[in-house]
Amino acid sequence: MLYWLAEWLGFPGALNLIRYLSFRSGAAVATAMILGLWIGPRFILMLRMRQGKGQPIRDDGPQSHLAKKGTPTMGGLMILISLMISALLWMDLSNRFVWACLFVTAGFAVVGFLDDYDKVTKSSHRGIPGRVRLLVEFLIAGVAVLLIVSRTGTDLYLPFFSGIVIPLGPFYYVFAMVLIVGFGNAVNLTDGLDGLATFPVIIASLTFLVIVYLSGNVKFAGYLGIPHVPGAGELAVFAAAIIGACLAFLWFNAPPAAVFMGDTGSLALGGALATIAVTAQHELVLVLVGGLFVVEALSVIIQVFWYKRTGKRVFRMAPIHHHFEQLGWPESTVVIRFWIVSIVLALAGLATLKLR
């Protein structure tokens, strides 16, 4: 909105700064973080009053988690409010990539909210039926992919190699939809310990802030040998807003958490990151940068598949962060070590920009 206003006025004086992605990205971080810190205490109090028992805690999980009973969920709404306000203020709203990201973020947030609401009101872990949830997520992802691909094409670029492209054609639509839905649910599965998902989301967002900025600049993209996507740089502002909103949320989600993100936040953030990656045509780099989330999701898939096939478990408990808890690792140890892994994977993802 501010970009439109400044453009309408002709970018006079200090408003000329709004032309620059770097300025608007910094402003988006600050705006989202300040908003999040301001609404946080009020929002948490409201959630406590409305939810009563808070998020249901699994009885078959680590015994230390029983102390978390009564902690409110749906804290992702705090993230969404500060993220959306900041993004709408500082982004160029004439950019279709912006609307694709906003659509996935809001759509997945609604799905997550309904799931959280069902769990809280029924004091159950089930939520809305999985098939219904996946169907809606795929429909949302499909709309976003149509918006994006009309400007980017259907080629898949391989990281670490310059000029090697796999033309997927119509199959790209399915691939991109699976990536968006899968990554959204992978972040959701990771959000099981205080701060575990939030910090890696910040790291992944920072990484893709750099990637989309470079992809959107024809000179940088040409120098690095990465696909140039005109207009993709605008999503650097969106990634910055995610960072600011998540930093504010982490203030309240740090152990012992005063609020949980819930499916409302985790689904939305995962979907948003994947949509940014699809726009920048760095889909496989997302799998590397978000490797922590991928491993968490794979641990659940492997556990369920193997148990149904043999009646035995591969892990003591899935997702895999609970496996390490069952091995005797304190929650804080699991969280910090997983944070370290996310940083290393992000650095590896950035290395793909140069190592070609």
From Swiss-Prot:
Is-annotated flag, keyword Cell division?
Answer: yes
- Does this UniProt record's set of keywords contain Iron? no
Q: Which residues cross the membrane?
A: 27-47, 73-93, 97-117, 134-154, 163-183, 195-215, 232-252, 258-278, 285-305, 333-353
Q: Name one GO cellular component term.
A: plasma membrane
EC number(s) given by UniProt: 2.7.8.13
What this protein is reported to do is described as: Catalyzes the initial step of the lipid cycle reactions in the biosynthesis of the cell wall peptidoglycan: transfers peptidoglycan precursor phospho-MurNAc-pentapeptide from UDP-MurNAc-pentapeptide onto the lipid carrier undecaprenyl phosphate, yielding undecaprenyl-pyrophosphoryl-MurNAc-pentapeptide, known as lipid I.
- Put simply, this protein is called Phospho-N-acetylmuramoyl-pentapeptide-transferase
Originating species: Sphingopyxis alaskensis (strain DSM 13593 / LMG 18877 / RB2256) (Sphingomonas alaskensis)
What gene is this protein a product of? mraY
